[in-house]
Structures are given as C-alpha cells and as structure tokens.
Amino acid sequence: KGYLYWGDSPWCAKVESEDAAKCTLFPASRLVTDSKRELLESLTAAEKAMVRSVFLTQPLPENAAGATLLLPRSFVEDGLMTQAEQNAMFKAVAAKYTAGPLFIKTHPRDTTDYHALFPDAVILERTMPSEVLNFCLPFKFARAVTVQSFVLRAFTAADEKILLSLEEAQALLN
C-alpha cells in the first residue's frame, strides 16, 4: 500500500502526544497524552546530571549567574550570507545582548567555529537537543537570544527570550 506516516497505519492503536487535547490530526479516541515534559521535569538532580554527562564534553562553569544563551543557526548553509557576514552578525548580536557569561548552543547543521569567534564562551555540543537545556542544567539563563528561528517557542530555561529577525540582527552591524 505504500508508506503510511505517523498514526495513519491501520496497525497503530494509539498516537502519543504531549497534549492530546491540542492535537487535531487524529480523532480523540486514537490519542493518548504522554507528557515528556512532565517526565523530564520529574527527574532527580542525579538523573539530570546523568543526562548532562551524555551531552557535555566539558564541565560547566561554577558560576553561571546572569548567563546569556546564544542559539545561532547557519545562514551560510542556507545560502543567505557568507561565513564572514554571519560571524560579524553573531558577534554584534552577542555584543548587544550578552550579560554575564556567554553560552552558545550551536545548531546541528552549523559548522561555524564558535570557539574561535568567542574564546571565552561555553560552547555546548551541537548534538545536544536544545530541549535538553530546559531540564538538565543546574541553573536558568538570564537571557536567551536567537535570530530568525523558532527554537525559543518552547524554551523554558531563560527568564528573558529575545527573538530577532534577520533584518534586526543585520542592523546591529551598522
């Protein structure tokens, strides 16, 4: 019969959703609420440390008070600018919005050398899902900043979330 995606297979008895009441793709009788958020929030400190150890290749700084998280994406890979233009733009974004220690969570497709661009920043592994930041770090960021990305929509690990358009970020270069 060909490829049947998601819960469309006749052999699929139920479809799990974070919140079945908000899902409109399937009838309510086929849906089950299974909140991963609640599961992750219920982890003990030791369990969270174990999850961190999977993704972190270096220890976290002792003091992360007032930390800013920059979540860049690759505009170079998307053909929207050169590497030099992207580097300059993210340096300008970081200069304007960083307060306290700077953490950078790179996008999996982004091959930029953020260690070279921001030698004092804590660079989180590109293989770490950004969702892990919501529950596994022992602190909350004061601010999270991204450019033309939806990554902050479900992000809960920052007191302030700043979503810049590409035009707003590029304007910081002037």
Where are these regions (language model features)?
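Active-site regions of enzymes building and remodeling cell-envelope glycoconjugates
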Residues: 3, 14, 21-31, 116-129, ...
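Surface-exposed cleft-lining segments at the edges of enzyme active sites
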Residues: 39, 43, 72-84
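Catalytic donor nucleotide-activated moiety binding site of glycosyltransferases and closely related
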Residues: 98-126
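A donor-sugar binding/catalytic signature common to diverse glycosyltransferases
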Residues: 131-173
